Amino acid sequence: MLEHFPWLTTMIALPLVAALFIPLIPDKDGKQVRWYALGVGLADFVLMSYVFWTNYDISSTGFQLQEKFSWIPQFGLSWSVSVDGISMPLVLLAGLVTTLSIFAAWQVDHKPRLFYFLMLVLYAAQIGVFVAQDMLLLFIMWELELVPVYLLVCIWGGQKRQYAAMKFLLYTAAASVFILVAALGLAFYGDVTTFDIAELGLKDYPIALELFLYAGLLIAFGVKLAIFPFHTWLPDAHGEASAPVSMILAGVLLKMGGYGLIRLNLGLLEDAHVYFAPILVILGVVNIIYGGFSSFAQDNMKRRLAYSSVSHMGFVLLGIASFTDLGISGAMLQMLSHGLIAAVLFFLAGVTYDRTHTLSLAQMGNIGKVMPTVFALFTMGAMASLALPGMSGFVSELAVFVGVSSSDIYSTPFKTVTVFLAAVGLVLTPIYLLSMLRQLFYGNNIPPSCNLEQDNLSANSDQEAVCFGTSCVLPGNAIYDDARPREVFIAACFLLPIIAVGLYPKLATQTYDATTVAVNSQVRQSYVQIAETNPRVYAEALTAPHIPTTDFATVKVQP
């Protein structure tokens, strides 16, 4: 009986339906609402963990837990959801990060009902993006996610919250048009009209159409992944968003871009990917170096972490474009690893802001003695971000480096330059992170004081602005308190899997390796066919790739 139960639909419906009951909860100060929202988030995370543990086969490369029925037949729209090795780990990541972000927002008292309503709607939309197997359904879920994020930044942000929220909305909404165009182009090509992603993968598209749609999807997913030059919304959004919202922005929303590239660009447009892969490599290197230098130049703590995310997403691009099993596996692990690391760093940035009421690194310093636990947790998160051995970040970035270096598609000079430049960017990471720790917790600066009376006056001048890390204005005797048990628990929930995956990467890689190997095999077969058809033209490309003898075919190059 349970074999045919709509588990994935339930995962989406639970937070969405539960959000509708929030207005009915009799609650003035938000205490009951926050417990209700946390209970719903935790229940959904426990549900997905149970379902994947008991009903998901990690050795399978196909879609599992499939549910499909006609929804709006006039538009060819079906409710089609399923998971595979690419989506299942990201669903778990979304569940963990969003549940803990709800717990991190424990002291929100400004419009708490609306806040937790939007958080639960966002929870459902994130899961919907990762499990959708219908292109129109994917587009709907993609758009649904924009609204709560816009409102969460616009209402519970800093003084420039409206500018940051509008910039996020314009960037992502404009980019999502390319997803709709791609959906229509893929669906209506050929004799059969369908939006089902699995069926779209069976069509044989002309290379011109693939290149056009690939470019559009690269823009759409590049905005979400914060690829240069489409990244500028991210530092502004992080700089103005509250800590719980920043946790979701960095921990989950960025990963939607990487997921889309693997699912659609590699999965459906593999011929076009052969031509675009060198461009992805170049963009990845630019992201790594540009993000590193830009991060070092930031005085705002959250903007520094935002540019750090830009840099780390460059490794995802390198892995996706590597044409190797290890490289794509490293890209997946980088998304999962960064989702945990970025979430804990932004959470701890919010914890620090609660005490100091400033994000300016120049105004901080010498608070390590009064907040030793926060200092220790922040240091562990920073070490994970700079890829310290024993942490998940080290494994993912090493896999990408080895994957690119061992690729038999690119020429040796191209690989050498790529690895060297990426290594330069990697060296920048400890520079800007360790300098941030020094400015935060060391130095001779007097710890920043918080004038509660002045804070109240500032709040009155902008009544809709809510400046908080994980809370609003704290009592005077709590400004320099060390981490509370709730905050230690949240940080530990992120740091423990970071360390566990760093020590035993198979905990994560075994969930998706079968699928990423299948995706890479498909892409490599496309490369062989293209090179076999026109080896001279392709060999004259910028990267000067040579045509290897692969496991799939022996390529004969005509003189």
UniProtKB/Swiss-Prot annotation:
Entry's Gene Ontology BP terms: aerobic respiration; ATP synthesis coupled electron transport; electron transport coupled proton transport
Reactions this protein catalyses: a plastoquinone + NADH + (n+1) H(+)(in) = a plastoquinol + NAD(+) + n H(+)(out); a plastoquinone + NADPH + (n+1) H(+)(in) = a plastoquinol + NADP(+) + n H(+)(out)
Main location: membrane
EC number of the protein: 7.1.1.-
Places the protein is found: Cellular thylakoid membrane
Segments traversing the membrane: 5-25, 35-55, 86-106, 114-134, 136-156, 168-188, 207-227, 242-262, 274-294, 310-330, 331-351, 374-394, 417-437, 488-508
Domain of life: Bacteria
Any one GO CC term of the record: plasma membrane-derived thylakoid membrane
Keyword terms of this UniProt record: Membrane, NAD, NADP, Plastoquinone, Quinone, Thylakoid, Translocase, Transmembrane, Transmembrane helix
MF (Gene Ontology): NADH dehydrogenase (ubiquinone) activity; ubiquinone binding
UniProt membrane topology term: Multi-pass membrane protein
Listed InterPro entries: NADH_Q_OxRdtase_chain4, NADH_Q_OxRdtase_chainM/4, NADH_UbQ_OxRdtase, ND/Mrp_TM
Broad EC category: translocase
Stored PANTHER family: NAD(P)H-QUINONE OXIDOREDUCTASE CHAIN 4, CHLOROPLASTIC, NADH-UBIQUINONE OXIDOREDUCTASE CHAIN 4
Family: Belongs to the complex I subunit 4 family.
Function: NDH-1 shuttles electrons from NAD(P)H, via FMN and iron-sulfur (Fe-S) centers, to quinones in the respiratory chain. The immediate electron acceptor for the enzyme in this species is believed to be plastoquinone. Couples the redox reaction to proton translocation (for every two electrons transferred, four hydrogen ions are translocated across the cytoplasmic membrane), and thus conserves the redox energy in a proton gradient.
NCBIfam families reported for this sequence: NDH_I_M, PRK12561.1
Entry protein name: NAD(P)H-quinone oxidoreductase chain 4-2
Organism of origin: Synechocystis sp. (strain ATCC 27184 / PCC 6803 / Kazusa)
Lineage of the species this protein comes from: Bacteria, Bacillati, Cyanobacteriota, Cyanophyceae, Synechococcales
Encoding gene per record: ndhD2
